[in-house]
Regions:
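Hydrophobic residues within well-ordered alpha-helices
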Residues: 58-59, 109, 146-149
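Conserved small/polar residues in nucleotide/adenosyl-binding loops
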Residues: 151-153
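N-terminal hydrophobic or amphipathic helices and topogenic motifs
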Residues: 1-62, 78-84, 99-100, 128
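Short, hydrophobic alpha-helical packing/hinge segments within bilobed ligand-binding/sensory domains
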Residues: 54-55, 143-145
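A conserved helix-loop-strand patch within extracytoplasmic ligand-binding domains
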Residues: 70, 79-132
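Short hydrophobic/aromatic-enriched beta-strand-loop microsegments
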Residues: 28-29, 131-141
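Short secondary-structure boundary segments
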Residues: 9, 70-71
Length: 153
């Protein structure tokens, strides 16, 4: 029986995850351009996925465990649990406002259009703050959305 670990195929977590696996003495052969790699010294397979696919792969049993940022875990809200926080690759989600605006507090976002790659997390946060805003999902280059007049923030 093999333990299948889902990890990020590229991006911020990739290097730290590969170091973590190496420090755990899990030896992987031919990692580049492979989606599934078996360890040469342990009954372990490593499945390389997009970070936003990892929570679902664990929840559905495609992978036994996954290494993913907590932001993706919370956003996807899949039926999986955090077993251990590994302590690397911290993430901070922020709300941005125009430079020429003096920030009066979270109520500034009331009635505004906000672009995000994390609509679930943002929606939950805004509800806890009693702020009603229009959320627009953008999966990449969120920072350019205000300049294109797609959204306010």
């Amino acid at each position: 029986m093999l333990l299948r670990i889902a990890v990020q195929a590229k991006g911020r977590l990739y290097d730290e995850t590969m170091s973590f696996l190496g420090e755990s003495d899990i030896k992987l052969n031919a990692v580049k351009r492979s989606l599934l790699v078996q360890s040469s010294n342990f009954p372990v397979e490593v499945l390389f996925l997009r970070d936003d696919d990892i929570p679902q792969s664990v929840a559905t049993g495609v992978a036994d465990i996954g290494i993913v940022g907590e932001n993706e875990y919370v956003e996807k809200n899949e039926n999986a649990e955090i077993v251990k926080r590994l302590g690397f690759s911290k993430c901070r989600l922020s709300l941005a406002i125009p430079k020429d605006v003096e920030y009066p507090g979270v109520q500034w976002f009331e009635g505004r259009k906000i672009a995000t790659s994390y609509p679930g997390i943002l929606s939950t946060f805004l509800k806890t703050q009693n702020v009603n805003a229009e959320i627009h999902v953008i999966t990449g280059s969120v920072e350019v959305a205000p300049g294109l007049s797609l959204i306010h923030i």
